[in-house]
Amino acid sequence: MIITTTPTIDGHQITEYKGLVFGEVVSGANFIRDFFASITDVIGGRSGAYESKLNSARQEALAELEKEAKRVGANALVGVSMEYQSMGGDKGMFIVVATGTAVVIR
């Protein structure tokens, strides 16, 4: 499946719009445990543990987005965007939301 942030796909014609689809992932981070587990990352100014969690959540959200597009009969996604929000206050939860327009191309 072609997944793009652009509204069109070069070399393909959109023949049908299936609608807006979403892929959402809620994840958590145990800040105390992860901080001590990756102290060298934090000292260096970056946290590899958190970057890894965020990357995993992003990949899961895109996989959910693709699954939803297939469910509605699409073979491509256009106008894809990603949003990140913290939630849960001091519990360290965050949500990653992928959105896009499911389309049929030829």
Swiss-Prot record:
Residue ranges of coiled coil: none
Domain of life: Bacteria
Pfam family, one: YbjQ_1
InterPro entries: UPF0145_dom_sf, UPF0145_YbjQ-like
Gene3D superfamilies, sorted: Hypothetical protein apc22750. Chain B (3.30.110.70)
SUPFAM superfamilies found in the cross-reference section: YbjQ-like
Family: Belongs to the UPF0145 family.
The name this protein goes by in its record: UPF0145 protein APJL_0492
Native organism: Actinobacillus pleuropneumoniae serotype 3 (strain JL03)
